[in-house]
Amino acid sequence: MAEHHLSRFARDRYLLESLRFAAIQDARRVAAQMDVSAADLYALGLIDEALRTLLQRQAAPAQMTNAASFLDQSLGADPVRATQLTFVSEFPTTSVYRGEVSPVEYLHREEGKGAKEEEKEKHSRALSLRGEIVSLEELLLVNLHNGNPAATTLTPLFDDAPLEETAYEKMIEGLGKYFRDLGIGDQAGESLIDMLRAPARASPHSLAGQLEYIIARWGDVLGADFVTRLLRGLDFVKEEVKRFGVGGPGGETPVPTYFGEPEYERYSPDKEWMPRLVLIAKNTYVWLEQLSRKHQRWIQTLDQIPDEELDILRDRGFTGLWLIGLWERSRASQKIKQRMGQEDAVASAYSLYSYDIANDLGGWEALNNLRSRAWQRGIRLSADMVPNHMGIDSQWVIEHPDWFLSLPYPPYPSYNFNSEDLSDDSRVGIFLEDHYYNHSDASVVFKRVDYQTSDYQTRYIYHGNDGTSFPWNDTAQLDYSKAEVREAVIQTILHVARNFPVIRFDAAMTLAKKHIQRLWFPEPGAGGAIPSRAEHGMTRSEFDAAIPQEFWREVVDRVAAEVPDTLLLAEAFWLLEGYFVRTLGMHRVYNSAFMHMLRDEDNAKYRTAIKNTLEFDPQILKRYVNFMNNPDEKTAVEQFGDGDKYFGVATVLATLPGLPMFGHGQIEGFREKYGMEFRKPKWDELSNEGLIRGHEWKIFPLLHRRYLFADVENFFLYDLFTANGAVDENVFAYSNVHGDQRGLVLYHNRFADTRGWIKTSAAYLDKGSGELRQKSLAEALGLPFEGYVIFKDYVTHLEYIRSCEELWQKGLYVELHAYQHHVFMDWQFVDDERWGKIHFALNGAGVESMSAKWEEMFGVKAEAVEEDVRVKMPRKKAAGKKEERRKKAAVKKPAKNKKPATKSSLAKHSEGAKGKKTAMRKPAGKSNASKGSKAQKTSSTKTKSVKSAKRFQALLGHSRKSIVEGKGLSRDEFWRNVGGGVYEQKQPPSLRVAEKQKRYRRKAQKH
């Protein structure tokens, strides 16, 4: 095999024998001596090898011999031989460099003499060439490297300056002419030398770009094995960029889409309490310190948390308490943070020693006490589980070092481990890489020394890492390619589940199969996420053999079987949210888009995200965890302020389907971001009493009504159409229904004013039919076609009245100022012409009490009676004497002994009521009991009306379905026959009430 001709200077200085490196580690060693990029050095070696292979395949031995003869004839044999002698002297092979062969002897010997027999067969071409022919190839390759702008920093390896006084340049020109005339090249009119220079021309300043060019252009020629090595080289380059140019995730928050590879659906079923869970986070040590200050006594353990604090959480509507940092933490982590200047720090909450409750928090006994008292108040405790890694001095690192990803050598020669031993266990030494302490490097490994072995066995264990930023220097990365590790983690999860009904999995996305491989065992060409891991990659088949199924799917199934009634919550990003709940079966998953997009007022993007989810699978929406801050982000008040925008977004948080999660200090308006290593807050902040009162007025009542908003079966999102027909993407309008209770939420997330109509919902997937459907606002809320509806705004606490007919035909007209929001609940249906007068008088305005407004206008209190609120058939006008009697009855005063309704009876709501709602009827002069047979007739009429209504509803459903499916009744026919106008943005001419009532009745009777 031909040797690489490196400069004598490179051999003297760096003891280098070849540009081809058997392992990336060799390239790192040489690069460390040269103070150049190891990735560039390794990439150039691959480029050199690729060009050499192409040269030898394109130019047969006879052609190279003829090329040498051509140079002898055109330039003269003496100048050519002199140039070759100088070249072999300045760029010697190993045998020439060692003095075993002189340059003259080398030029006249057959290359490869003395090679093993199997090598001879493999490299038969090299054996057929004399040294002078091989040196001609090497001369050409040296020229190509010197002319490569991307290889400038590596010039000492092949600097051709010593050849300036020879015929070197003329020989290169002669070779170009010879191969051009011969027609050897990749394209017509291109010489062989032009072809070999193409990668440098295509990507003059990037060796990685040249590798990509070679793969794309000549991959088939070079063969699959060599292409795999080229892809590994690309991965190595990416790793070096990552190592020396690390940055956070940054960038815009992506909008979730669902058009990738098909994924199976396998949701985990919810228990009844799960959709109604409202979670609040508390950094445990910080919270205990704050409680100590508040109550003026030491509160240091979990059992000392006062009952009144749990009462406060219950009264505010919280049903889950996430305690951050309960587990026994790494002592080495605390030492590192204290050495870095945080003298009062504890260890990170995510660098764990073991899954036992920390002793200084009171241990298991204190937890049991708190858990019992919290459960008495309907509050479930939640804890973290950190499956990706353990602390660098954890029990597992001490007792099971083979469970972690490690190497027997440091991956980079520049790493030194001369700092203090961080281990408290005499059996093992733990050493952090020196450059961590002066921030000059972020090592991907730490050193573990086993003092129990005679040779002090040393491992270099990888730190935990998600590939987005620096390694977590107080953690050790578990090796998930090992089945025993996966089982050990699952057993730990089951242990946590037996003690906490809600588990939050930290950084869960790192353990999805594709990300385990991407980060730690990358396929060729897919590496670069974590420095030094490309050389330890696996093919897809190798990886699937090591990890046959998704780890999280196995976890979900095992927990469901062994510890049911446990809610599993995943912190997952990277557009995996839908996959985690729909396919892997997690009950809930983080939705960071909520915080980022509403904060940045990317309203169109967030509305698109909701619409995409509704069109793909609405069930995903109810499994999101929505939040306004989390422990890794700025506080909520820093991001949203403490005014209208904050309360608008908090209202959306409390009323969207999903799990609302409030941050530590969010309600009090605290601005300090608590680090995971904080023992106590560093700022002495006072609670923002105005913000707390605002929550009590606007937010907490909504948390107590989570059952109304938590699910998606009756959730609909609406567009607000402005006067010019455009959709205002800054308005969030949506409704939900639970039983007989209805809720409509409006929020304008922009510093501006807007107005318009809300009528038709966004499309949603009907999973029964597999079709996309829409509903009108009136249909979604189940409103009757006639009469009026009264509802209450839980933001202003005003009551409003609207015409049901208008809501069906036009929708709801709204005007919204900057960051204004409304939550309309307590919907009641009334049917009396005097309510029409109130509706006309108010002209859309709200009042504190509709009962009071009735009394003001008519001098009597309205009477509330229970009435069936299903869609009612419009009553046909009575004729003759019956009509006269009805009119007289309408103006009579109520009986003196009749108890009038109060405001509370009008505005009340009942979660348990089924099919009943408080409604207003016209006051009657006599009770039904005094009317005798007339009461029976009224009852009979009502029964017939209900039956007619059912027939009409069936007809209406058939007609709408026909419109949606494009068959049966046309839109115009629908308007003429049923008069709903649900799907038409443009309303038809209004019909007189009497005509519509006749048509309703006629159509129902015909049906």
Give the ranges of each region predicted by the language model:
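Catalytic domains of carbohydrate-active enzymes, especially glycoside hydrolases
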Residues: I305-S330, K337, H495-R504
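Carbohydrate-binding surface patches
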Residues: A723-L781, M825
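Intrinsically disordered, polybasic Lys/Arg-rich low-complexity tracts
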Residues: R875-K961, E965-S970, K986, S990-K1003
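Solvent-exposed beta-strand/loop surfaces of large extracellular or lumenal domains
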Residues: F785-Q809
